[in-house]
C-alpha cells in the first residue's frame, strides 16, 4: 500500500509531558489523542499503546519515550510522553530536548514531588521555553483550598527555576474522566479542550533554524529488509531533501552517504524541516556502521572534536546534586543531544576545587570525538543522577 503524504497545512509544534511518576502523564497523553480525535479526526491512542515497553507494565512506570500525534484547530502536535521515574532521567534528557513547550502533570492529591522538581530543573537545563501545568486527579480533591495551595506551590517551584511562575497557565482537571468520556464539573473532556486551546495560544512557534546547514542527532537505527538502513531523530536545524549528500559524524571515521528516503509518522516526505521527527533512509550504509549519538550533517559543516571549554552550573546538595566538591581530573558523563560520553575535567588555574552550587568554567577532554560546537548545551551526570548543566563556549582543536 502506498504511504500517505504528510499534511503540512497546520503549524507543527513539539510538546511533551513531564512530572512525577504516577501523576498521570501517560493518561493525559491518551486523553489528548482521544479528545483531538473526536474533534479533529486525528488518531486516538489508547493508554496501553503509549505505555508500550514490556518492562513498564510489570512495574507500572514509563521507561521509554513514546511519540504520538494529535491536532487542535490551528496546530499539529508531535507529543513525547517522557519517562517519569528517577532511574530513567537519561531518557528524560533526550526527550525533553525535543520540546517547544512542556505540559507539567502534577497530581492535585499529592502536590509537587521530588521528580516534579527534577523535571522542571531538566526542562530549564535543556532549554524548554514554556511550561503549561495540568493539575490532574482534581476529581479526587473535594477541598478547594487544597487545590489553591497546590497551585501556589507549583507556581513557586517554577519561579525558583526561572520560569514565569506567576503567569504560567494552570488547567485543573482529570485526565481519567476525559478518557472515560465524562465531564463531571467540567473536569474531564472540557479540561482537555481547554488545555488544547491554551497550548495553541501559549506555546510560541519557535524560529526554526531552517537557513542553517542541516543537522540531525541520531536517536535510533533500524534495518529495513530490502531497503537498507534508516536512522531516526529530530532535525535540529536546516532542511534535508532526498538525493542530498550528507555525512555521519562522531565516534568513528566520518562517512559520506546519500539520502534516499524521508518519512514522518509513516508518511513519505520529499524534504524534512528543522523541528520535525523523521526517519531517513541512507544509501549503502550497514546497520553496524551507524549508532545512536552520532549526527547527520550537511557535508563538510562540522568536524568531530574531543576538547572544549564550557561554562557549567554544578547543582547544590539541596537541588539533588553532589554533597562534596570535585577536583581536577573529575570524570563524569556528559550528555550531548542523544549521547552520553565520559569526559575528564580540568579546572582554571586559580581554582583548586568546585563546590556544589558553583558556577565555573571547565576545560573538558572527551574520551571519543563527537560533533560539538559553540553554544551546544549538555547535562553532567554521575552515579545515576544529574549533577550539573553547561554550555560550550569554545571548541578547542585536538
Swiss-Prot record:
Database matches in PROSITE patterns: G_TR_1, G_TR_2
GO CC annotation, single: cytosol
Residues annotated for GTP binding in this entry: 19-26, 81-85, 136-139
Region (G3): 81-84
Region (G4): 136-139
A GO molecular function held by the record: GTPase activity
Keyword annotations of the record: Cytoplasm, Elongation factor, GTP-binding, Hydrolase, Magnesium, Metal-binding, Nucleotide-binding, Protein biosynthesis
Region spans: G2: 60-64
Catalytic activity: GTP + H2O = GDP + phosphate + H(+)
Main subcellular location: cytoplasm
Family matches, as InterPro entries: EF-Tu_GTP-bd, EF-Tu_GTPase, EFTu-like_2, EFTU_2, G_TR_CS, P-loop_NTPase, Small_GTP-bd, T_Tr_GTP-bd_dom
Annotated region described as G1, given as residue ranges: 19-26
Quaternary structure note: Monomer.
Identification of the protein by name: Elongation factor Tu
Organism (species): Carsonella ruddii (strain PV)
